[in-house]
């Protein structure tokens, strides 16, 4: 009883193995056939590696800062264009639409240090500090388009009073001469011709000098006198209230005013006559006052 099932199992397993082997062989054969067909098709097409395409991800992400990267990209783009047979438009250079030009190699840090700047030639420093002016076109050099020259503002002319050309110089009087002239002026402000001649000879001065000094001294005395009179007028002005507030009252004082007001209000006589109440004075004066705020002189 035990041998039969075993035989059946063995047969089943053998059959399964044979069936599975046949299916695997068939699938491998189909894959080989597809591979050969794909290889034939790929062989018929031109082979272009993805790294040679100028717009591939590898080409765009490539590090162009490395030496020779730009040349490799240009060569790859030219190879791709030759393989594809595509025509470039006019005015477009091969590889011009690729990645931007690689920056120049960075200078060493010591080039921008203080020592490096000091070691630079003077010509380079002068050229860097004062760049040349751009050339002007002919129409800009024409005087028609050039701005007018700036006008220099001259200083304003002096507006002081000009003296006469034939003016005589000022006489430098000595202290003794000034004292004698002041003493003589206090005695007499106007001198006669004889007195002036005698006095000028005693002071070693000319008659014209003495005459002019007396004229100036009289004008000065007049100014001083006018200023003194103005001060006296200001000091003599009384500090009185205006005439509008100086109300006049009849003689008799405020009591008479109150009595007159009561008589006119309640009558001259009567059984119900009240005693007059004291009234405060309305004005400042109890008699007729004719003073005003300013005195006329």
Swiss-Prot record:
Disordered as annotated region, ranges: 13-50, 77-107, 129-169
Crosslink site: Glycyl lysine isopeptide (Lys-Gly) (interchain with G-Cter in SUMO): 9, 127
Composition skew (Low complexity), residue ranges: 25-38, 77-88
Pfam family, one: Homeodomain
Taxonomy, superkingdom: Eukaryota
Compartment list: Nucleus
GO biological process, one term: positive regulation of cell cycle
Keywords, sorted A to Z: Developmental protein, DNA-binding, Homeobox, Isopeptide bond, Nucleus, Repressor, Transcription, Transcription regulation, Ubl conjugation
InterPro entries membership: HD, HD_metazoa, Homeobox_CS, Homeodomain-like_sf, Msh_Homeobox_Regulators
Biased amino acid composition, Basic residues: 160-169
Record's keyword annotation contains Lipid biosynthesis: no
GO MF terms held by the record: DNA-binding transcription factor activity, RNA polymerase II-specific; RNA polymerase II transcription regulatory region sequence-specific DNA binding; transcription cis-regulatory region binding
Post-translational modification: Sumoylated by PIAS1, desumoylated by SENP1. Sumoylation of Lys-9 and Lys-127 not required for interaction with H1-5, transcriptional repression, inhibition of myoblast differentiation, or binding to gene promoters.
Annotated Gene Ontology cellular component terms: nuclear periphery
Keyword Repressor found: yes
Family: Belongs to the Msh homeobox family.
Role according to the record: Acts as a transcriptional repressor. Capable of transcription autoinactivation. Binds to the consensus sequence 5'-C/GTAAT-3' in downstream activin regulatory elements (DARE) in the gene promoter, thereby repressing the transcription of CGA/alpha-GSU and GNRHR. Represses transcription of myoblast differentiation factors. Binds to core enhancer regions in target gene promoters of myoblast differentiation factors with binding specificity facilitated by interaction with PIAS1.
UniProt-listed PANTHER family: HOMEOBOX PROTEIN MSX, HOMEOBOX PROTEIN MSX-1
Protein name as it appears in the record: Homeobox protein MSX-1
Species this chain originates from: Propithecus coquereli (Coquerel's sifaka)
Gene field: MSX1
């Amino acid at each position: 009883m035990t041998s039969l099932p075993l035989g059946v199992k063995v047969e089943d397993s053998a059959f399964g193995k044979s069936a599975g082997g046949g299916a695997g062989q068939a699938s491998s054969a189909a894959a080989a056939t597809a591979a050969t067909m794909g290889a034939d098709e790929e062989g018929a097409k031109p082979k272009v590696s993805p790294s040679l395409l100028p717009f591939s991800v590898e080409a765009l992400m490539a590090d162009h800062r490395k030496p020779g990267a730009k040349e490799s990209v240009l060569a790859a783009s030219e190879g791709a264009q030759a393989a594809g047979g595509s025509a470039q438009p006019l005015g477009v250079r091969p590889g011009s639409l690729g990645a931007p030009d690689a920056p120049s190699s960075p200078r060493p840090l010591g080039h921008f240090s203080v020592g490096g700047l000091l070691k630079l030639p003077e010509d380079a420093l002068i050229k860097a500090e004062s760049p040349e002016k751009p050339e002007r076109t002919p129409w800009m050099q024409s005087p028609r388009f050039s701005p007018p020259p700036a006008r220099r503002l001259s200083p304003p002319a002096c507006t002081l009073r000009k003296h006469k050309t034939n003016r005589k110089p000022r006489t430098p009087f000595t202290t003794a001469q000034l004292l004698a002239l002041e003493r003589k002026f206090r005695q007499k402000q106007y001198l006669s011709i004889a007195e002036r001649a005698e006095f000028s000879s005693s002071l070693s001065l000319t008659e014209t000098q003495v005459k002019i000094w007396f004229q100036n001294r009289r004008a000065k005395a007049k100014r001083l006198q006018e200023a003194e009179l103005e001060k006296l007028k200001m000091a003599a002005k009384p500090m009185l209230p205006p005439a509008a507030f100086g109300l006049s009252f009849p003689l008799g004082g405020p009591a008479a005013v109150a009595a007159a007001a009561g008589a006119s209000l309640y009558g001259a006589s009567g059984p119900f006559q009240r005693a007059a109440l004291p009234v405060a004075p309305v004005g400042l004066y109890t008699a007729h006052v004719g003073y005003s705020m300013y005195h006329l002189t």
